[in-house]
């Protein structure tokens, strides 16, 4: 039953609500400005600035939340505002959002500010937005009809497709000229015809394209859909810089699984200029219907909204399930305590209070490693994480062995409280949540020969792509990598991660005498950040089946020269080309267009 006041009588309540919305509006204005600048940097080929903008943007949200919280504390003594006034603040805020174009994001911002100011006993729908209050359906950009969420094009026939795609590209008004747009458009049309074969053109045949480009790494993506009769097909066209410095259309992606990988949790967030983000999410859900809205918001750079929606989905799942949280199967980690809910496809990771030898680390250092991954280009090889504080779980849903494990390994991270319904709850003070994957060591142990070979190929590619992106995993054991549902190998254990350019690539010195040669111990000096690729054989090639596949595909991983060549290119300022789609789909490989850009791996990337 609602306990909201019947009258909105407080001027302070309105002023606080207005201040909070002003804070959000400032945040989103800056967010959009970065997205607009991404187009300028892409046109100029200024990849280092693009990377820096991507990193900086991640901090925008928390900066505005802190800034707004300080204003409320200083000007309104927010922590001492009475409960009834806080309820009026929420109602005033809802009123201010009536015609807002980003109401769902503004509600999440309200929650973020409140959770900084209020005790967690206030984290219910009377005071914050546990459920959304404003609908995002059918929000239209009436102020700028020339910039709709998406544009519709009508080819009319197969013959009209070339002109249609040329108009699509021109409408993005890219300043950098194309190398040969007519040639590239011809490749797009040919790719469409080869994919669909002899399909009948329906009267409603049309192409819808989102009005903003999607920028990530060194690529700008055109994202759309093809509608014909009662079928809808995804469409993605990557635009890249050619060797001449001019632009080219690199491929046309028409398979649902190919578009899914573009929005995978293993990739960095896109930079997209969106007036109405909910409309973009609705469009993207149409071409990726099984993709959770939380993941789509996150991939668009709106990770706080994604985090909010994920938590709502999680609470909904808890309400409609009855299985218990258990300790995650597999080899126990030295730093993290990992648990899972079997019916839910995620794992929960809590930093332990104590770390046995040989681990030398701290809680703050581990958290900084996870933040590094959040800000860095994940190139499809590192899992994104959701970070939460003070999460309350029903104690009755926790397996007794798991509770004992938490009390033993992470006592400072848990506490108990009485829930609103009177039931006992266990509160986890800090937790990371990641998509659950099959640990690579288990995949290699239990897989067929074909699966094992695929796993080793993917593992080697993952290592090479990570170091090309300036990431050294630290602990390269197979147990620290997972296999996604589509068979891609992804790194997910970050407590020893570091920038590859901070590492010293070394060869193992020649032994100076027989005693050193026969020694079972390391007899040479090892300094911090030293890596010896030749020694990786010891812990990677123990299984004869693995050894055979590994040496067939990735023997160069044991060659210090390969590692040093990557480091030298990074130090020279080179930004590698990473393709979030199989390189076999590139027009240079399909139709023989002049080549440009060398992928890190020497064969087609698989979809994750």
Swiss-Prot record:
Family according to the record: Belongs to the AceK family.
Cellular component GO terms held in the UniProt record: cytoplasm
MF GO annotations: [isocitrate dehydrogenase (NADP+)] kinase activity; AMP binding; ATP binding; phosphoprotein phosphatase activity; protein serine/threonine kinase activity
GO BP: any one term: tricarboxylic acid cycle
Pfam families: AceK_kinase, AceK_regulatory
Keyword Cell wall biogenesis/degradation: no
Gene responsible for this protein: aceK
HAMAP family reported for this sequence: AceK (MF_00747)
Catalytic activity: L-seryl-[isocitrate dehydrogenase] + ATP = O-phospho-L-seryl-[isocitrate dehydrogenase] + ADP + H(+)
NCBIfam families found in the cross-reference section: PRK02946.1
Major subcellular location class: cytoplasm
Protein name, per record: Isocitrate dehydrogenase kinase/phosphatase
Active site: 384
